[in-house]
Curated annotation (Swiss-Prot):
InterPro entries: RNA_methyltr_RlmE, RNA_MeTrfase_FtsJ_dom, rRNA-MeTfrase_E, SAM-dependent_MTases_sf. It is an enzyme of class 2 (transferase). This is Ribosomal RNA large subunit methyltransferase E. Its EC number is 2.1.1.166. Specifically methylates the uridine in position 2552 of 23S rRNA at the 2'-O position of the ribose in the fully assembled 50S ribosomal subunit. The keyword Methyltransferase applies. The keyword Hydrolase does not apply. It is found in: Cytoplasm. Transmembrane segments: none annotated. S-adenosyl-L-methionine binds at G76, W78, D99, D115, D139. HAMAP family: RNA_methyltr_E. GO terms for molecular function: rRNA (uridine-2'-O-)-methyltransferase activity.
Length: 238
């Protein structure tokens, strides 16, 4: 073991058998990531939970008693945070987690294993939760191909789909939070969000790895009437 620049002991993984270099580097990063260790201590399912905690600590959109939907929720770190903050376990708030994959139960969270892109998904969610929601969360990332431009388009396309879903299910004044990656490809997305929400900004939590282009788009104050087809709608300032 060696110490890193902060004085912490750093674990180095020796190459063993058929372990690929990419797997070795990923394992080293996981073993040396303080947020991974903290998540285990706090009983959280992923380090990503701290990103939502940081964003909400600053912008305060997860309020007790509100309704939240978490898209692409597995393994459930964001759903855990949302459930705790809105009081879902004691029935004050509601959280619905949606994913194509199965997800172990979380107290206070209703789970729907479905494709949010399906035409009937918004109606099914509204039926489950008993009306429109206050917050839509998305920490989803599109499958990548290794081709930079193709991957950027896939990533932005997924966020655009999540934003369209949010506009179908949000109450006026609602909030949409989604993972994006820094690139020029999301300009159209931001323009559209500024038509549908009062405030739109990018956020980079400290728990997001410094070497990652990952950041989050935070759209607050849903106007209540999606303007997808209104190209002449006035744009709000962020």
């Amino acid at each position: 073991m060696a110490k890193d620049t902060t004085g912490r002991l750093r674990v180095t993984v020796k190459s063993a058998g058929r372990l690929k270099l990419s797997s070795k580097l990923w394992l080293e990063r996981q073993l040396n990531d303080p947020y991974v260790a903290q998540a285990k201590r706090d009983g959280l399912r992923s380090r990503a939970a701290y990103k939502l905690i940081e964003i909400d600590d600053k912008y305060h959109f997860l309020k007790p008693g509100i309704a939240v939907v978490d898209l692409g929720a597995a393994p459930g770190g964001w759903s855990q945070v949302a459930a705790k903050r809105v009081g879902a376990a004691d029935g004050r708030g509601k959280v619905v987690a949606i994913d194509l994959l199965e997800m172990p139960e979380i107290v206070g969270v209703d789970f729907a294993q479905l494709d949010f892109l399906h035409a009937e998904a918004p109606a099914k969610l509204l039926s489950m939760i008993g009306g429109k929601v206050d917050v839509v969360l998305s920490d989803m990332a599109a499958n990548t191909t290794g081709h930079r431009k193709t991957d950027q388009l896939r990533i932005v396309g997924l966020v655009e789909d999540a934003a369209a879903f949010a506009c179908d299910v949000l109450k006026p004044g609602g909030t949409f939070v989604a993972k994006v990656f820094q690139s020029g490809a999301d300009a159209t997305l931001v323009t559209q969000l500024k038509r549908d929400f009062v405030t739109v900004k990018h956020v980079k939590p400290a728990s997001s790895r410094k070497d990652s282009s990952e950041r989050y788009v935070l759209a607050m104050g849903f106007r209540g009437v999606p303007t997808t087809h209104d190209a002449d709608a006035p744009m709000a300032t962020s």
